[in-house]
Amino acid sequence: VKVTVEDKALQFLNDVFAAMKMDVVMDIAYDEVEKHLDIDLKGDEMGILIGKRGQTLDSLQYLVSLVVNKDSEDYIRVKVDTEDYRKRRKETLENLAKNIAYKVKRSRRPVALEPMNPYERRIIHSALQNDKYVTTHSEGEEPYRHVVVTLKKNGER
């Protein structure tokens, strides 16, 4: 009997939610061609699963990724989401990026953001990559790596 990617993820998450005494409905979709596993969680206490700035959700996603990729020949990308958290967080970060860029232009001083995971740092970099006046770069070591927004020097692209 071949255990599917969905089965592995479902089994693992069922065990986690049982241990947490949480009632969670899972919607799982696996794209065989793209090697992408999408898991959407629904339930009453999703705030607990999201955690502070999505850290719990990110950890859960990382663990599911370890489980489904353990004996897999191809790398499977895993996304775990609930209540459109990922989309809302992306919008929040894009707005933050624009506000910080404005602050940097006004004050003419660099601004360092709070530490973020690679995915969130990439959102900030992307949001400001076409800005004429500011540039972004990451500094520090994980898990304290963060984005710094700086005023471009004259002629810098």
What are these regions (language model features)?
Residues 1-157:
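RNA-contacting regions in translation and RNA-metabolism proteins
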